[in-house]
Amino acid sequence: GIQEVRDIQTVLPNFTVFDANNTRMPKFSVRGLRENNFGVGQSVVGLYVDGIPYTDMMSRGLSLYDVDHIEFLRGPQGTLFGASAAPGGIINVRPRQPGAEWVGSAGLGYGNHGTREYRLNASGPLTGQIGVSFSGLYNDRDGFVTNLPTGQEIDGRESVAGRLQFVLMPREPWTIRLTASSERYDDGFTPTYSPLSDAGPFKVSRDVPGYVNTDVTTYALSADFSGEHFTLSSVTAFRNWEQDLQQDFDFTAIPQPVAEMGFIPVIGVSQPDVEQFSQEIRLGSGDANESYQWTLGAYYADREMDNVSGSLY
């Protein structure tokens, strides 16, 4: 099944997801457009989750859980989505919404390399005008690459995520949604194989195993109005994305300092911190049977990024 954004490539023709040096920043390739960016930047494919724009590549290694359906709209979609400057298209993920009755499910998975996964979701009405949904995910996987100096398995991964949503229907035809979600990913750094110094593709020698720790929080307020003559949709969102990354740049087990040996080992570090506030408003025709349809929209975003990046010698 589809458990991450990267899994969409298994069911979507002419769409490929590939990893670079960071498991939480997969790159996309679609319609002959391939991303080569290293770091933070705009994507060739845009991503929306529950109407919230995920505008940079750092937001795309997320887990998908309690999803109702996923749409992929090929080509530029500036008419429908304000944040879409992506030429390749838009991935539109729609989570399941609470209904008139209580429903829920739980899942347990186990796989190779000690993979363990637990999923839980429940949704239903609190009152006649208020619904609630909760979903959560925990995933853990052991590493399968041996670091020869220590004998330990590296590149293990652990993730936990949760989302809480309230749906208010104060009076027809209004629907208001309040959403909060949080995700935590603790990943061992993807080992880079060096044919000159490593014993094989699954055996490496590193004095610093490396890690990638990622925290993401999202808060959103959505309001929808569906009238006889027009429809109105508003999405106000705040997202914070933080990452702490460390990797061995010299691809050896030589410790620091060894300058007297004529070799200086290098450790790469990066700590990006991104905050974004966005407001999107869409106004459209109300009757789908009319001979003409119209749409009008506005999008505003205020994005601030700080990044501490460099090398330790």
Task: Please name every model-derived segment.
Residues 103-105, 110-188, 214-217, 221, ...:
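Transmembrane beta-barrel wall of Gram-negative outer-membrane proteins
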Residues 27-31, 45, 72, 85-107, ...:
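N-terminal periplasmic accessory domains that precede
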Residues 8-9, 70-75, 91-93, 134, ...:
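Non-catalytic regulatory/gating segments with a bias toward low-complexity or hydrophobic composition
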Residues 6-52:
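Extracytoplasmic beta-strand/coil segments of soluble accessory domains associated
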